[in-house]
Every structure is written in structure tokens, then in C-alpha cells.
Amino acid sequence: MTYPKPDQMLTVRDSNFIFGSLGTGDAALRINGISVPVWPNGAFMGWLPVPPDSAPRYELLAGNSTATARLTLPVRVPPVPDTTRRDPLVGDTLNPVPAPDTILPVPGNVYVTLGAPASAVNDTDRVTIARPAPGNGQEYKWFLFPGTVVKATGSKKASGDDFVRVELDSAQESWVLRSELQAQNISSTAPQTFTGDSIAPVRRVGTVRIEPTAEWIDIVIPITGPPPPYLVEEGERSISLLLYGVTEAPVISMMPQPADSYLNSVSSTPEPTRVRFGINLNRAPYGYLALWQNGAFTFRVRRPPRIADPAAPLRGLTITVDPGHPPAGATGPTMLYEGDAVLEVGMKLRDLLTEKGANVVMTRTTSDPVDLGLRPIISRRASAHAFVSIHLNAFPDGVNPFVNNGTLTLYFWPQSIPLGVATQAALLSELGLRDNGTKFQNIAVARGTWMPSILTEGAFVILPDQEAAMRTPTYQEAYARAILRGLESYFTSLARAQ
């Protein structure tokens, strides 16, 4: 049995999948009296009612003309929600219970300092993530520098974590994990108490400089005081940079330079307690970095690479290939591990890219685990021109695998959509599976901003036929070839726009 494991808690009460391998395709299988399909390699996948509370187990009976075998698989099922009313009686003593959405206020003016996550290596990619609301599943909207000072106004527990409400300026609130405040701001004896300065930081913007180079354009914004909170938003041919909690409208000075083929103009609009910069481009945004260095906020706009030969669009470019996992990862019915399968695809893709003249950066070439947050950092440090993370998909409990399967490509930033669309089209052509689209998803490896970054879910490793295909060099090669075609299509489109 691959899934579920003995005594595993299921998270649904109606129907769920069960899969594993009989070791031979020459057998029939019934689970709890229901016939379950068996593939030629012995893998099986069933979509069955969840066992009742009174008999929480799967009874498997497999057999052919010569032998039979039985297996009892105990599982745990979630309890039935208690809908019994319990109205208080006269004379009952009731203890006040805070409402689940209660926000505990922080009294007075307390300004706290953000730090990088406790597990982070010191690197410019390491930021504190701020959300519009507390809890998991919320939008990751702001990516704030370590050392940013903000006002703490409230706290709340959500999704099992402690969150702090902070003001980016007087008109904008957001939420950060309590663990991402610097240690001196957190009371060790009173978890909901915060300590910090009582006076707001003063941030003044100086004269802005524009410093173009061959590969990027730096917009250098001198600021007195600590780094400001900021927000970056992309347009079709523009980037908006909003700095919170700053005063004085900046004066922009253009460095002596010839007409720039990529940067059209930079403008600034002062608003109460903030300044908005409009960066207008002659082409779509390709990549950028926000940097805090030497008392200045530097916004680095990356130029698209110049394609010397449109017939060989990858020649001379650097491509990061990221075989997903370990740690974690899904396992198929016959125990094909996702991390092993995508490593084979990644190595084949490396060879194909090399043949096309690309420089290839591999985030891993062995089965040793690589930290999730380190993968995009490896790519940025190599100044790669694209990042592709290779995965195989699986399902959460309660999703019917016979209805919901196919090929999917994911992105985080809008600049990555064209690469995602081109790669998804090639995957559909090569792998021949259902189109699950090119979609936004909050995935860590695709949150790097310096280059287009995507994650591919080529097939479902837990489906017997797709797992069997992924064991073959032919299908692995098809997966790799699809990504190559997507990259070629994307960079060819950049060549046309030069």
C-alpha cells in the first residue's frame, strides 16, 4: 500500500482515493467489495467511499486463477461535526470566550523592527513577507527588507501562528508573523506584549539618480533613516514602486546618457506619507531587484537579454533547471518518487539546453535535499535568464483522480506569464495530457524577481498510467523536450521585440 498508510487520518468523510501495487497485473482487486482497476504493471487506483466510523478500515481482496491474498488496512476518519445545541440553563456560570476573530490591540505607540525569517541565510532574497490579512492562504503582497521599522497596532493567532498587525504608513496596514520581528521587540514573559521605540522613524527622500548599465538600470533613491516599506506592481510596459512612510517629494536627475532603448521615463508622484515612482518601459518588464545599500533604496530594472541569433535563441543564455524535491514530494503506486523522476527529466533537459548553446545551472544533480528557499537564490546569484522548476503533481484528500488530472504550469509574478504560457503549450503537445492551464500560485521557488520563473507539473505521479510513463526514458525525454521548446519559443518572442 502506498496511500493511505495504516492508521492514517483521512481529512474527508465522503470519498477518497486509495492506491498501491499488487506486484502483477495478472490479478483482480476488490476493496470493501468494490472492483478496483489494476494496470498491467500491477499498480491500482481506487476512488471509494470513506469507511464508516463503525468499521474504519479498507478490506482488500486480490486474486487470480492460482492464488488470493487479503489485507486489512485500518484508517482513522474525522469525527462527525457536533451540531448539538447546548443552550445555557438558568444559574449556569459562563466564562467569557474571545471571538475567534478577536484582534488584541497594542497600546500606545510601539515601533518594531523586522528581521529576516529565523531560518534564513543572510541574503538579499531574504525578506519579511507581509499580508493583507493574518493566516495561511493570504496573498503575499509586500516583501520587506530586514531592518524595516513599522508601528505594531495589534496581534492575532491565525492558522496556528501568531501574527502582528503593523502600519506601513498611516493609511496602510498589513500583517507579519510575530517570529519575524527582531528579538528585542518581543517580550519573553508576555507573548502579546511588544517593546520598541515610541517615536516614528523619519525617512526623507533625497535627489534620485538614474544609473544605466549594459545589463540593468539602477534607480537610486537616497533615504535618511531605516529602509521604508515598499510595494512593487507590474503593468504591461511599466513598473510602479510605492515607498511608504517617506517625506519630501524627490527630484529626479538623469545621468548623462544616450537615449535608452528600454527605459522610457521615470516619474514621481508625492502622496500623503508616501511617494510613488512610475517606471515606464518600451517593452514588458523582464526582471528587477529591490536593494537597500549604503543608505539608499536601489531599484534595479533588468534589461531583457539581447538575442544575437533568433534562429538559436538560447545560445549564450543562462538557464536554471530546478528538479523539484527533496525534501518532501509525492510517491506513485509502484513507489516511484517524484524527486527521482524529475531529476531524470532535469538531467535530460540540461543536455538538451547545452546542445542549444545555453549555460545551465542545476540546483541539484543528486538525491541530496536542497532547501526550498535556496533554489531561487542559486539562480539569482548565477544571473540566470530563466528559472524552471520541474515537478509531478499529486492530489489532496477528497479530489477524484479520474476527473482532475492533467498538465499545469504555475507562476507568481506577471513577468513570468509569457514563459509559462509558451511552456504549457509545449507540454500539452509533447505529453498529450489534459490542459489544466497556466495559473498564478503562491509558490516559493517562483517568487524570485530577477528573471522569469515558472514551475511545471507535467503529469500526476500518483496515477498508475502516468507513473508508468514517467518511468520510461522516452516520456522523461518528452517532458524535457517540452520545456526546451517553451524556452525557445519565449526567447524567440523576445528576439522579435528587440
What are these regions (language model features)?
Residues 5, 11-13, 25-28, 37-320, ...:
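Short linear recognition/processing motifs and adjacent strand/loop elements at protein termini
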Residues 15-19:
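A short beta-strand segment in extracellular, disulfide-stabilized domains
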Residues 142-148, 339-347, 351, 355, ...:
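Solvent-exposed, polar/charged alpha-helical surfaces in well-ordered, non-transmembrane soluble domains
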Residues 160-162, 250-252, 308, 328-332, ...:
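Extracytoplasmic/secreted cell-surface and envelope-processing proteins
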Residues 182, 325-328, 365-370, 392-397, ...:
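Solvent-exposed loop/turn segments at secondary-structure junctions
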Residues 301-386, 396-399, 403-405:
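Active-site histidine-acidic residue metal-binding/catalytic motifs
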Residues 386-389, 396, 408-411, 437-498:
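Active-site-adjacent mobile loop/cap segments within catalytic or ligand-binding domains
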